Amino acid sequence: MLPGLALVLLAAWTARALEVPTDGNAGLLAEPQVAMFCGKLNMHMNVQNGKWESDPSGTKTCIGTKEGILQYCQEVYPELQITNVVEANQPVTIQNWCKRSRKQCKTHTHIVIPYRCLVGEFVSDALLVPDKCKFLHQERMDVCETHLHWHTVAKETCSEKSTNLHDYGMLLPCGIDKFRGVEFVCCPLAEESDNIDSADAEEDDSDVWWGGADTDYADGSEDKVVEVAEEEEVADVEEEEAEDDEDDEDGDEVEEEAEEPYEEATERTTSIATTTTTTTESVEEVVREVCSEQAETGPCRAMISRWYFDVTEGKCAPFFYGGCGGNRNNFDTEEYCMAVCGSVMSQSLLKTTQEHLPQDPVKLPTTAASTPDAVDKYLETPGDENEHAHFQKAKERLEAKHRERMSQVMREWEEAERQAKNLPKADKKAVIQHFQEKVESLEQEAANERQQLVETHMARVEAMLNDRRRLALENYITALQAVPPRPRHVFNMLKKYVRAEQKDRQHTLKHFEHVRMVDPKKAAQIRSQVMTHLRVIYERMNQSLSLLYNVPAVAEEIQDEVDELLQKEQNYSDDVLANMISEPRISYGNDALMPSLTETKTTVELLPVNGEFSLDDLQPWHPFGVDSVPANTENEVEPVDARPAADRGLTTRPGSGLTNIKTEEISEVKMDAEFRHDSGYEVHHQKLVFFAEDVGSNKGAIIGLMVGGVVIATVIVITLVMLKKKQYTSIHHGVVEVDAAVTPEERHLSKMQQNGYENPTYKFFEQMQN
C-alpha cells in the first residue's frame, strides 16, 4: 500500500506543478524579476524582451525589507497582479548597473541573486525528475520560514541520503517570501555529476552550491544578497572610487548590518570545525580526504572568491568558485579553511615531507586581498565624514598584522637554524634562502597593501573635497545673489570657500608627494596633471574673488577682512614651506582631512622654463577696485568658469596678474624634486596663494627696491670676478709644447715649470702688482 500511496502523492504533486496560472502570465516572454546591488539603481526584467533594465524612476536602490521588495515589484510591473516575492534559486550576471543621477551607465558586471515577482495565485514550480533521481517534499504547518531556510533543509535531506540536491521549489506560502514547505529532487552523486556536466551552466535548473559548512542561515536571508554583492564590489571598488565624485551612502548601513552576521557565522563555523577535527579517527580521515581534493570551479560561470587547502604548499590558497558543483574543499574564508584542514593535514604532511623543508603555518603572501579584519573591511566600506579615522585604524591594523607575521617568520627561522646545525651545508643554504624569500615576499605584500590603502584613501578624500568645495562655492554665490546682500554673510561664505580650495591644493600636493616616493616613474607621468590641477585651482579662486565686483557695495565694506584673510593664507603657506624643509616625512597617507594642519610637510615648486613663465604671472590681482567697476544694481553674479583664462577670454584691469597670460606661451612648467639624505625628498613651493596688493600705490617703493637690487647684484658680480681672477696663477699641470729648436737649458726649465717650479723673481713682481 505504501508504494501505491507514494505514486499517488507523486502524481498529485506533479499535476500541481504543471498547473498554469490563469491571470495571463503565461504569455510573457520572461518571468518578472528584480535585482538589487547596494549603491546602484535597482534592475528589473523586461517581460517583453527578456532583458534587464534599470529603475525607471532613477532613484530606487537596495531595498532592505521583503515588504519593500514586493511593493517595488508592483511598481515596476503595474500591469501584472504581483502577490508575492521569492528569492531565486540561481545567481545571475547583470551588466550596465547605473548610479544615481548618472545619464550614462557603466558596463560593470555584478553577480546577484534576484527576487522573482510571483503573479496571481501561487503555483509551485515544475521540477524535472531525471532517471534514478527521487522527488521529495517536506511540509510543516507550524513553521513559516524563508526561501534560504528551506533550501538548507532540502540540501541536508539529500546529504543524509548520500545524494546531491538537483532542484527545488517552495510550497505553501505563509507570508512575503516565507513558506511552510519545500519540494526538491535528489540525484545520486554520479548521476548528478553527469546531469550537471551535460546541462547548460546558466539555466535555472542548475544547483546553487553555497559552499562551506552547512550553517544555519534561517535568520540571515537578507544578509546573503549583501554578502554576494560585497564579493563582487571588491573587484571594482578602486575603479569606482577613482572615477566617481560621489560616495555610495546607501550601502553603508546594509554593509554594516552584514558584517555582524558574517563574523558570527565565521566564529560559529570555526568552532564547529575545530571540534569536529578532534573527535574521532574516522572524522579525521574524512577531513583529510576532503582537504586533499583539488580545487574545482564547477560548471557555473560565477566569480565567487573562495579558499581551498593546497596540500603541496601546506596552506590555504584563494580560487574562484563558479557558483555550483565542485567539491567540499571549498571554504568562505582562509581562517575557516585553516581551522578545518590545518591541524589534520599537518601530521600527514610531516610524515610525507620529512626530507623537505618544514611547512610554514603562517599564511604566505598571495595576490589576493588581506583578511576581512585588516584592510578589506576598510576598502569595502564606502567613505564617510570619519574617513581619516577609519583610514588610521586600517593603517594601524595593517602594520600590526605585518609585524606579527614578520615576528612569526623570524621565530621559525631561528628554530629552523637550530634544527639545521647537523645538516649538510647545502641544506643550510636552502633553509636560509627559503626564509629570505619568505621575508622578501612579506615585505612586498605589505608594500602593495599600503599602496592600495593609500590610493583608496586619496580617492575618497578627493571626492569629499570636491563636494565640500562645490557646496562652499554654491553658498558663496547664493550669498552674493541675495537681495539685499549681507556683507558679513558673504565674507563668511567666502572664507569657507577659500579654506576648501586650500584643502584641495594641499591634498593634491600630498598625493604627488606620496606617488613620487613610491613610484617616481608614475610621478613623472602625472606631473603635468598636477600642474594643470593647481592652475585650475588658482584661476577658480581668482574668478570667485572677482565676483565681488558685481556687488560693489559688499566688496567695499568687507575689503579689509578679505585682505586679512588672504594674508593669513600667505603666512600659512610660509609655515608649510618651513615645516616641509625642517621635518622629514616619516609616515604615509597624510591627507587634507587630518585635524592638525601643523603636521603638513609638503609643498610644490612650479619652476619656469626658458624664461617664458615668470613669478609675476602667478601673482593674483587685487580683487578690489570699486571705483573702476560699474555699479551692479541687480546683484547678478555670473557662474564661475573653471577653464583657463586664455580659453574663456577673461579680461582684467591693468596691473592684474592674469593680464597677458596665454596658455600657448607657457611651453612647460617643471616640478623638480631632489632627494636629500635619508629624509626623503623635498619639493619646494612657489607660493600659489592669492594676496590683495595694491600695485599702483607702491610704485615708488618698488622702483627703489629694484635700483638697490641692481646695485647689490653689480657689487656681487664684480667681487666674484676679482676673486676668480686672483686664483689664477702661473702653475700649469697640463702638457706644454716644447720647441725642438730651443737649447737644453730652456728645455730643462720647461720641465721644471711643468713640475711646479716658479721663478721667485716673477712671483715677487706678480705679488707687487696685485
Curated annotation (Swiss-Prot):
Binding site for Zn(2+) 1: E183, C186, C187
Region (Collagen-binding): 523-540
Region (Interaction with PSEN1): 695-722
Residue span of region CuBD subdomain: 131-189
Bias kind Acidic residues: ranges: 196-207, 228-264
Phosphothreonine PTM sites in chain numbering: T729, T743
Region (Copper-binding): 135-155
Residues with site note (Required for Cu(2+) reduction): M170
Cross-link (Glycyl lysine isopeptide (Lys-Gly) (interchain with G-Cter in ubiquitin)): K763
GO terms for MF: DNA binding; heparin binding; serine-type endopeptidase inhibitor activity; signaling receptor activator activity; signaling receptor binding; transition metal ion binding
Extracellular face residues: 18-701
Domain BPTI/Kunitz inhibitor: 291-341
Annotated spans, Zinc-binding: 181-188
Segments carrying motif OX-2: 344-365
Binding site for Cu(2+) 1: H147, H151, Y168
Domain E2: 374-565
Phosphotyrosine found at: Y497, Y757
Protein name: Amyloid-beta precursor protein
Species lineage: Eukaryota, Metazoa, Chordata, Craniata, Vertebrata
